[in-house]
Design a protein with these regions (language model features):
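Conserved metal-phosphate-binding beta-hairpin within the catalytic cores
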Residues: 38-64, 282, 325, 337-346, ...
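Conserved N-proximal alpha/beta basic substrate-recognition cap immediately N-terminal to
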Residues: 81, 104-275
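Short solvent-exposed loop/turn micro-motifs enriched in small/polar/acidic residues
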Residues: 39-42, 120, 165, 333-336
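C-terminal active-site "lid" helix and adjoining low-complexity regulatory extension at the edge
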Residues: 2-9, 35, 63-97, 356-427
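Short, flexible loop/turn elements at secondary-structure junctions
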Residues: 47-52, 62-64, 102-103, 154-156, ...
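Glycine-rich phosphate-binding loop of ATP-grasp-fold ATP-dependent ligases
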Residues: 237-250, 278-306
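Phosphate-binding site of ATP-dependent enzymes
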Residues: 54, 256-266, 271-278, 290, ...
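Low-complexity, highly charged intrinsically disordered N-terminal segments
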Residues: 1-28, 38, 44-45, 56, ...
Length: 427
């Protein structure tokens, strides 16, 4: 199920949300059956955008940081989920090694590592933090502003295992997305569980592959709800490798942008939506170099090309994804906000709002200047009444977020099955 958390939604429940609330038993049964056939990612975080008429995931992170943004009240949910996940993968586990990002001395990021260490310690494991950063040659302890501290130890490689001094883990938890490539020290670890698996890293993963899988999940969920899948799915176009420093590259991207905008315009017309449609252009491989650009017409492509072309050295050809833009109608203290839902195994364990006071409702909020507002548990005195439809007495406005986020997690499960190098080839 989904915890009852307080959202920024204050208006009346719209048709889509009501359908989701009314379909709660059917939805939960559907997820249970799916998880009998598919293995959920070990953990993930999903960025959602709620435009009022549409709620859709715009990013699914399989190596989530930010665990320190969850409230202390959410800790028991995370611990229970961690226990379930470990029990399923390695029931005899005692020792867990967490591997953080390299070159990360940010106290905010390290507070996230401390929270992960706390969660798995409370789940009954011995937990150490092992760094694969070549610059870390001996244990270092970093004091954090809240009084916590974290000790980073250099990882030691054996023949078929890794660990840290006097600590041999059976399970390795990656909290780094390896977008620069998979280092040799993590390869061929056939005697230890590596979570998430290496093929979940951005070295091989593509956003377009994820959203292709999500498109399939959205169709099935839409059929269950009796609703248009578009209401929970952002359309997209995969551009492939494009060199935006060349006229042909700009033309190709411009064609894809116009094609997707035309599809979105048709949907807006069908639903009587008066907003002006837009798309976002981003790297398909999860790299952050080109950023995320909002475009309302093909003229914006030339501006993006000029901006990237001014960089030295020029970035060259990049895999690019064009995705339907989804407005966000949510606000926290007048600032534009988007919910981020955190999951472990198949469970929703919490979430927070990412907010940005200087960004518009059609812009990417994952940018310098953003901040985070934890979601609190609903302190409702209205208990559900027997005989009343699910969700009718005290509706959980967070439930819809939990459904769409879990649908994205299910899509990630499909995606990892398809990209698993050890899986049997499917005809």
């Amino acid at each position: 199920m989904v915890p009852h958390l307080v959202t920024a939604l204050t208006g009346p429940i719209n048709e889509l949300e009501q359908r989701v609330l009314d379909s709660m038993p059917a939805i939960e049964r559907w997820f249970r059956l799916e998880w009998m056939e598919h293995t959920p990612p070990f953990y993930c975080a999903v960025d959602l955008r709620n435009g009022g008429f549409k709620l859709a995931p715009v990013d699914t992170n399989l190596f989530p940081g930010g665990w320190n943004n969850l409230t202390p009240e959410m800790l028991p949910l995370a611990v229970q989920a961690a226990m379930a996940a470990i029990e399923k993968i390695c029931p005899e586990a005692r020792n867990l090694l967490v591997i953080p990002e390299n070159h990360q001395q940010s106290t905010f990021y390290l507070a996230n590592i401390v929270q992960l260490q706390r969660i798995f310690h409370m789940a009954g494991l011995n937990v150490r933090i092992g760094s694969i950063d070549p610059a870390i040659k001996k244990p270092i302890t970093v004091a954090l502003p809240d009084g916590d501290s974290v000790t980073l130890e250099p990882v030691v490689r054996g023949k078929r295992r890794i660990g840290v001094k006097d600590f041999d883990p059976c399970t390795i938890l990656l909290n780094t997305d390896l977008n620069a490539g998979v280092p040799g020290i993590l390869e061929d670890l056939h005697e230890q569980y590596l979570l998430p698996p290496l093929h979940a890293a951005w070295a091989t993963r593509r956003k377009s592959a994820h959203f292709k899988c999500y498109e399939e999940v959205a169709k099935r969920l839409g059929k269950l709800l009796g609703a248009d899948p578009w209401l929970i799915h952002p359309m997209f176009e995969r551009c492939g490798a494009v060199d935006l420093s060349t006229p042909s590259g700009l033309d190709h991207l411009g064609t894809q942008v116009e094609a997707l905008l035309a599809k979105v315009r048709r949907k807006y017309k069908e639903y009587g939506i008066k907003e002006k449609p837009f798309v976002v252009v981003k790297a398909d491989d999860g790299s952050r170099g080109m950023g995320i650009s909002t475009m309302r017409d093909a003229r914006s492509v030339a501006e993006l090309g000029a901006m990237l072309g001014a960089r030295q050295p020029a970035p060259g050809a990049q895999d690019i994804l064009v995705q339907e833009g989804v407005l966000t109608r949510e606000r926290i203290n007048e600032a534009v906000a988007e919910p981020v839902v955190y999951m472990m195994d198949r469970y929703v364990v919490g979430g927070f709002y990412r907010i940005h006071a200087e960004r518009g409702d059609d812009e990417d909020l994952c940018a310098p200047g953003s901040s985070f507002v934890p979601l609190a548990f609903e302190q409702s005195t209205h208990l559900p009444q027997p005989g009343v439809k699910p969700g009718a007495s005290a509706p959980n406005r967070f439930y819809m977020y939990g459904v769409v986020a879990r649908a994205a997690m299910l899509a990630a499960s499909y995606e990892l099955e398809l990209s698993d190098p050890e899986a049997e080839a499917f005809s």
